[in-house]
Amino acid sequence: MRIDFKRPAPGFDSAYFRKYYFTAATRVTTAAEMRRRADLIAAILRHSSIPVRRILDAGCGIGLLRRAFAESMPRARYVGLETSAYLCKRYHWTQGSVVDFAPRAPSDLVVCYDVLQYLDDRDAARAMTNLAKLTRAALYVSALTREDWRANCDRARTDGAVHLRPGDWYRRRLRRRFNHLGFGVWLRKDVSAILWDMERS
């Protein structure tokens, strides 16, 4: 299957979320998978002695991480940020974009899961610069890459109308302000933490 790496992103309406989140046969992820992801993030941050009191989920979708983080980090306040007017009306999320969202204060943990591939190069770069401003300590980033499309994802369940880039495109930009702890979790360079040599990626 050929894919145009510059195809425009779809509208994030009810039809989109019905296909990729609400229909079992076509959904891209499950609550159980997202719970494992939240548990992994929480474990890495606990191991690194990074306290989390405020979480920003930038591109929170239907909020699968909200309940999961409530279980793994019960003292943390969760804020869901979403561009979709449909989801903001349904779930009462904060409407906005990771490209230019500017809250009064940064969050201890920012999550940006499967968002950046929907942005063109200019907006994706702006979003990554803004993520550093939004993040007080830790950032979790996941984005569908060219390698993922070719070798890892289930294409029948994965939206291909995205901007597929090499993973290094993201990593180069993240490394300007963050150190990678592993499994998509990044720590701001100006945050004090003991990172054992062999545990760093």
Which role does the model predict for each range below?
Residues 1-105, 119-126, 130-201:
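Class I (Rossmann-like) S-adenosyl-L-methionine-dependent methyltransferase catalytic domain
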Residues 108:
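Conserved active-site beta-strand-loop modules that form the wall/rim of enzyme catalytic pockets
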Residues 111:
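A conserved beta-strand element that flanks and buttresses the S-adenosyl-L-methionine
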Residues 114-118:
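Short catalytic micro-motifs in class I SAM-dependent methyltransferases
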